[in-house]
């Protein structure tokens, strides 16, 4: 009898344990599925991006995004370490130019099969930024935006100088810049050209853009050598140097912050910077300006552009179901590009660019077409070093009136040396 009672007790305990386990499992699966996420957006960018994440979490009870914002200065160091250690989050933000630091080592997931299986709307993306995230024919990231260099124009200064049309050729730009200075006493062409505050990336971006406008390329097709020591590079650098040295439409030693403030305060006519400057400029009272794609001053429209992308770290045990959840989040974030456009960036979704919400944003519609003519940096792991080094060399060439051929020879040798180390 005692053994029988003990047996009944054991059976009861086993049943209770099973019930508790089942209840725990149900509790675990009944809650939302979590997608962890790292971003690098702070300040104004961070506020707009966080609003998209909040909206996703409000409208998706089954999936929740858990976002960890990392300061930009530390972001890629932390990301590189996490990917190498295998403890990266489920989803990451990565600049298009940085993708190649992780793709060759298999640290990012190839998305093609997952995109097809989940009917991801790839046809709704502008082709250029989408294709810039492909390597060896495979899609490794989805572009969130493009942020090309564009031209800002002070319309009041043009009116005071009697200029009716925005210049479309280099000769017109120079002539109008000179006229602005003669008629108004203001700066004609506003391009920063010193590393005093911030690297002179604007020079590299314009040098890059002018080469592509002529039909050239910055590097060879295989990205193994410089390709600008030719007539395209000569003409591009000559134009930038002449603005400072020959025509005096741009002062030498103009730093990034001063260049921004000169235009912001109405003291410059033609200002070149990325789309990210729009948010700051539109807050300036009584500044009557337009923001447009860089005209094809040297041929066809083409402009340097960066791009924030969304990628999925490759993990050994990642399930197709979890990838589906991540793609759901990516679809939502890119599909709400009108919210992100408030930070100045150009959406990559065609439906967003055609939406009323985007059209109603001031200035953005004026440069939305720049996405189609945006040119991404070459897909080489050496690009970051090339980018910074060329900015220094271009600064020296422009500010010191270095002979053009000498400057191109020096840049070519330096770039080829950098590439050889990768």
Indicate where each model-derived feature is located.
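Periplasmic solute-binding protein
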Residues: 99-107, 112, 128-166, 193-222, ...
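Glycine-centered hinge/linker elements that transmit conformational signals in sensory
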Residues: 176-179, 222-252
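Conserved C-terminal helix/tail region of periplasmic/extracytoplasmic solute-binding proteins
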Residues: 64, 159, 242-245, 369-422
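Hinge/lid segment of periplasmic solute-binding proteins
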Residues: 23, 96-150, 174-176, 182-184, ...
């Amino acid at each position: 009898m005692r053994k029988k009672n003990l047996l009944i007790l054991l059976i009861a305990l086993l049943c209770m344990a099973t019930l508790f386990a089942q209840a725990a499992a149900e509790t675990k699966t009944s809650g939302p599925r979590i997608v962890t996420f790292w971003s690098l957006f702070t300040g104004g960018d961070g506020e707009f991006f966080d609003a998209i994440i909040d909206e996703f979490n409000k409208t998706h009870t089954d999936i929740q995004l858990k976002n960890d914002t990392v300061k930009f200065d530390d972001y890629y160091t932390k990301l590189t370490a996490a990917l190498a250690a295998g403890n990266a989050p489920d989803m990451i933000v990565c600049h298009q130019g940085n993708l190649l630091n992780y793709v060759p080592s298999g640290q990012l997931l190839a998305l093609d099969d997952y995109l097809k299986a989940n009917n991801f709307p790839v046809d709704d993306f502008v082709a250029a930024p989408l294709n810039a995230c492909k390597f060896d024919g495979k899609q490794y990231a989805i572009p969130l935006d493009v942020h090309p260099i564009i031209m800002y124009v002070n319309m009041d200064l043009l009116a005071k100088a009697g200029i009716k049309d925005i210049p479309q050729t280099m000769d017109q730009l120079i002539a109008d810049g000179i006229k602005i200075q003669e008629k108004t006493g203001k700066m004609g062409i506003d391009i920063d050209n010193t590393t005093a505050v911030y690297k002179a990336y604007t020079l590299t971006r314009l040098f890059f853009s002018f080469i592509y406008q002529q039909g050239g390329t910055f590097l060879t097709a295989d990205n193994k050598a410089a390709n600008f020591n030719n007539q395209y590079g000569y003409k591009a650098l000559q134009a930038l140097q002449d603005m400072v040295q020959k025509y005096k439409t741009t002062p030498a030693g103009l730093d990034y912050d001063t260049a921004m403030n000169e235009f912001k305060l109405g003291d410059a006519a033609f200002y070149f910077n990325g789309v990210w400057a729009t948010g700051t400029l539109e807050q300036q009272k009584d500044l009557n300006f337009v923001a447009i794609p860089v005209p094809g001053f040297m041929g066809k429209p083409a402009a340097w552009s960066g791009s924030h992308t969304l990628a999925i770290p490759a993990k050994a045990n990642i399930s197709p179901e979890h990838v589906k959840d991540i793609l759901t989040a990516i679809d939502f974030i890119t599909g709400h590009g009108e919210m992100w456009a408030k930070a100045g960036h150009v959406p990559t979704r065609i439906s967003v660019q055609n939406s009323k919400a985007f059209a109603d944003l001031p200035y953005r519609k004026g440069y939305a077409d720049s996405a189609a003519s945006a040119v991404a940096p070459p897909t080489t792991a050496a690009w970051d070093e090339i980018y910074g080094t060329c900015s220094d060399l271009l600064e020296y060439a422009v500010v010191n009136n270095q002979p053009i051929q000498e400057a191109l020879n020096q840049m070519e040798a330096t770039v080829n040396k950098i590439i050889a180390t990768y």
